[in-house]
Amino acid sequence: MHGCSAGACACAASRPAVPVCTIGHSNRTIDDFIGLLRQNGITCLLDIRTVPKSRHNPQFGQDQLAKSLAGAGIEYRYLRGLGGLRRPRKDSQNAGWRNTSFRGYADYMQSEEFAANVDAVIELAASRTCALMCAEAVPWRCHRSLVADALLVRGIPVDDIIDARQRRPHKLTSFAHVEGLSITYPPGPQAG
């Protein structure tokens, strides 16, 4: 079993004092991206892409990104265990997601592997100002919004960095069903 159970996290004593952020690299220049991280006080970037490279934006390939961030004094960590591109299970409890990628990721969220990786984010964020990064510019089109939901139910505040003018608190997905630390997305009138 992972460190969190019965609504309380074993790492509660080391909860982050500041929100964990989410950000998408999109097609930004590396200078603009680093500027956005600095503007938001990010000291550690957590890469949650399944494939940590970009054909169209090579500045966000894992090696080049890590080098650029190191030059700016920002730590880089790759968290493969939070990567997207998951397939839905036939017996999915997450049929509220019409998007099969989100449904597959929501199914993965029920696993011990996912829980352990979320616990790792919480541990890292206890001593660093972290941002979860994927490729999509906006969080509502990216699996990082589901990771943010998982952090919220563990009592960890999350802010979504949209651009230089917008940083806003993440809100739990409207059709999420929460039981303790478990989140499902059942079908219903508000389903996505």
What are these regions (language model features)?
Residues 1-192:
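Residues lining hydrophobic/aromatic ligand-binding pockets adjacent to catalytic sites
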